[in-house]
A protein has these predicted regions:
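Bulky hydrophobic segments
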Residues: 1-126, 131, 145-155
Length: 155
């Protein structure tokens, strides 16, 4: 590997660390997931969605009705953000770690990381466990992975 390639890898690693720090802040430091008046067990039950596409379906219904601009904006930001914010991870993981260039290994790694994030958000009450977030995050990472490989082949 030549000197320019090593510099690009090093720059990618630095960007990845900054990206991870920003994502940790977004995922764990913005707002708590707790609901006043509920004990811990009730909090857990209130902050979990295990039904695939339940939240997505509800958000899409709001988007189609266009009844409340604030709620509409929240739905669009949530759906789009859960995809768009994870595209960089899909680009950077295979760029930095060659073993992550295999799609199945990449997908398993990303699914494991996102599952851990969702579980931590739930049990720390710093968010919720929403299977739809996991699905949308993985879609974003997969789009980044595809983009990485398409761009890499054109070189």
């Amino acid at each position: 590997m030549g000197k320019p390639a090593k510099k690009r890898i090093r720059a990618s690693r630095v960007f990845f660390v900054i990206y991870c720090a920003a994502m940790l802040w977004l995922l764990f430091c913005r707002s708590p997931g707790w609901i006043p008046g509920l004990d811990y067990e009730e909090q857990l039950r209130a902050n979990i969605n295990l039904v695939p596409l339940y939240t997505v379906k509800n958000y899409l219904q709001v988007v189609m009705k266009r009844t409340n601009d604030d709620v509409l904006l929240h739905c669009i930001i949530n759906l789009g953000g859960n995809v768009l914010l994870f595209i960089p991870a899909g680009v950077l993981l295979p760029k930095i770690w060659p073993k992550q260039r295999n799609f199945f290994r990449f997908f398993a790694t990303c699914a494991g990381i996102m599952f851990l994030v969702e579980v931590l958000q739930l049990f720390t009450l710093l968010g919720s466990f929403d299977i739809d977030d996991l699905i949308l995050n993985l879609i974003g990472m997969t789009l980044g992975f595809i983009g990485y490989h398409l761009f890499r082949r054109k070189k």
